[in-house]
Each structure stands twice: as structure tokens, then as C-alpha cells.
Amino acid sequence: MTVHPLYATNDQQPAYALRYSWTGWVTRGDVLATTGDAWTNLKCAWESDGLRLLDHLVRNNEVHLTFSTIPSVSPTFIAARAKGRLKYAQRIAGAPVTFSRKVSIRSVGDNTADAVEGYIRAQVRNEGFIDSHFSEFLEQFTVMSPRVDLRRPTETNSGRYWYNLHLVLVTDGRHRLVDDAGLTTIRDSSFRIAAKKEYAIRAIAVMPDHVHIALRGNLEHSPEQIALAFQNNLAHMLKRGAVWQHSYYVGTFGVYDMRAIRMAGSKKCSAETR
């Protein structure tokens, strides 16, 4: 018998803040050192891919692009579209360039990895539960994984990727799960889901009516796919029906935040190791 998922792309109303910096290295030619029209056309093309160009900077042989994206866009898709459309625009302009095979993609946000991890770690304390015994009980469902370092990149043949996501799921109707079995299932099953999908959970806080997860994603999977994987699999393992709202929050974060990227426009960019 076919098991149909409880959650799908077309029934979601997500909230998201997804931003990435892309760096490519030119080995031959000059990148769009001509008119601003070329960048305007590129922005329109990238928009059709679900990538909004927030900023661009060309320094020596380095090209730095900052995008915001929709949840259906994965890091590997960004890598392909960023370089592919840039090379095509150069060729059309009569100034073809050659890029290094390797690129760098970093997830960035308004908060750093330290801030996100600290926020998740403090969930129980920040809720201010009146019942101290219940607070102590909940602490066991907040887990920090010391073996997972979100500051380290995923190395591939095509470059280096930092793909860090903060995912939040909320129970339907803010229904509170307070039983040991249910909370344990969410905590332990989240790690099993991550292992199967090739994600790496750095921090998780299972609360009565929501769950926070900070993780490194599979580069081939979009934030949307990752959210749906947790929604569907956790609901299946809980055996309580559609326990989650048909929505989620997902945001990117990294070693440094958007403020550092904004400052890069007025300062010399630090070289990234290829």
C-alpha cells in the first residue's frame, strides 16, 4: 500500500530568510567590467531561478555574489546557476571568461552560528516555566552534538560549501506534547532522519509545542526538502497524524553574518582558500 506524505510543497506557508554568498575565481578574462546593463540583465535571469542578487563585488580575479533565495533552491543549484549565467552573459557580451572549477558557497544570515546555537541551547531557560520540575524534565530534550562543527565546510570536487540551517517546526494548533514518549520520539527520531538524509544536527531543542534544529544540510537538498523530511518522518514516527502546522521557519546562518558582507563592499575582501 502506498503511503502518501502528510506534508507537501503545495500545502505549505513557510517563513524563511535564506541568503548565500558565492565566490568564483576567474582564471582568464575580465568579469563584466563594462556597463551596469549586464548586471541588470543577470539579476532578471537569476530572479527567474529563484535567486535574488543582493550585492556583487569584483576584486582582481575574485567574483563575490550575495543572493537571497526561495526555499526550493539548493546550494548545488546556486553553484550551477551563478557560474552558468555569469559565463553566458560574458560570452554574449563578447568577453568570455574562464572560471576555476571550484567555487565557494557560504550560508549567511543576520545571526552567526554561535548566536543560533546559544539561542537553541537556552530554549528551556528562556521559556520561564513556573514548574521547575517540568523545566528540569525538558532539559533532556535539548542536545548539543560536539562532533558536529558547523564552522567547517563540506568539501567536494566542485568546491567548499557551508550549508547551515535553523529549522523550526510548530505543532498544529500549538498543541502541547508533554509526555516522555512523544518528546523522546521527536528528539531521537530527528537524529535518525538526519543520518538517513545525510544531514548533521549540531543542536536540537524539543519543546512542548515546537522544535528548533540547527543542522548542516545535504548540498543536493533544498531547505524545503529538508523541512518536509522532518515534518513527514517525525509525524510518521509519532503516529499521531498531522501533528505539525503546514508551515515552518527556515533560515541560513554561518560563521559571519550579513553585516560582515555589507562591510566587504568598502574594504578589501579577504581571500578564500580554494
Regions found by a protein language model. Name each.
Residues M1-R274:
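Charge-rich, low-complexity N-terminal segments
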